[in-house]
């Protein structure tokens, strides 16, 4: 497709996620894709936390760029309405990071309001809301693990940390969403591959230092914020919110500390060469 004679199917460089852009343009041009669940494509998540955040920033911003570029064309196309709706949800899903950050920042004000409400209102409003949100995310990841691994039940214990890590990305990815919507251009930063297969291998030299300190300070600041919120919830006996607050605290603390200290830790290990 990159060398296709049609201009609509040639490689274009106006988004950070060219594969996502091209796949949507191909479908708009009449191509149909077949998903083969038994075909696996090897992948590697960056072993550096700052590399991981850089990758997530690129994917998030790229999806927003594709949404700006193609959503109007998608809705003007002859595709089925359900396909248009699904494409809209798919391409705009990252807006949730802005909402997640706002929700995080409003935690203390909400806790203060909740102290004046009875437990009956907490059961009616908070419990169903948090339960459905948690069940939706958990169900999505459990379904993927069940499809990938025969012993998928072993992965359940990793779900809380996975959710905490996802929450901690809200600062990093909110910036990506805003940059994508306002048209702020940034270069494509390739994620180095090291062929890492176990925890004893990690890159010696840090590869992602840009804005690392500012983001890490923001994440550590949010960790301190949620530590205080956790204390307030315990002090005011709002015990139902403790697991939710603990997830945010764990995620921000882990990501912030690792972003700040991985450069020092990596120097204590051997350096594999990028592939």
Predicted regions and their residues:
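Transmembrane alpha-helix/helix-exit interface in multi-pass inner-membrane proteins
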Residues: 101, 168-189
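Alpha-helical transmembrane segments and their immediate juxtamembrane interface regions
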Residues: 139, 143, 211-272
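Juxtamembrane inter-helical linkers in multi-pass membrane proteins
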Residues: 158, 185-203
């Amino acid at each position: 497709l990159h060398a296709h004679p049609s201009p609509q199917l040639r490689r274009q460089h106006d988004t950070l996620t060219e594969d996502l852009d091209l796949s949507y343009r191909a479908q708009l041009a009449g191509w149909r894709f077949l998903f083969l669940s038994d075909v696996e494509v090897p992948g590697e998540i960056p072993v550096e936390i700052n590399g991981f955040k850089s990758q997530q920033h690129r994917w998030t911003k790229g999806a927003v760029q594709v949404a700006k570029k193609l959503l109007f064309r998608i809705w003007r196309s002859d595709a089925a309405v359900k396909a248009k709706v699904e494409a809209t949800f798919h391409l705009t899903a990252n807006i949730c990071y802005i909402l997640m950050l706002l929700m995080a920042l409003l935690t203390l004000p909400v806790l203060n309001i909740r102290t004046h409400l009875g437990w009956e209102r907490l059961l009616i409003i908070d419990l169903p809301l948090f339960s459905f949100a948690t069940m939706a995310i958990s169900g999505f990841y459990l379904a993927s693990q069940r499809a990938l691994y025969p012993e998928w039940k072993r992965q359940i214990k990793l779900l809380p940390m996975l959710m905490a890590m996802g929450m901690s990305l809200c600062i990093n990815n909110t910036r990506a969403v805003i940059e994508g919507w306002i048209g702020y251009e940034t270069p494509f930063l390739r994620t180095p591959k090291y062929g890492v297969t176990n925890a004893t291998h990690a890159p010696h030299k840090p590869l992602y230092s840009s804005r690392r300190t500012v983001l890490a300070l923001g994440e550590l600041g949010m960790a301190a914020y949620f530590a205080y919120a956790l204390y307030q919830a315990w002090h005011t006996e709002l015990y139902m919110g403790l697991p939710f607050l603990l997830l945010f605290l764990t995620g921000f603390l882990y990501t912030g500390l690792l972003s700040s200290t991985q450069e020092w830790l990596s120097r204590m290990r051997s350096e594999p060469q990028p592939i």
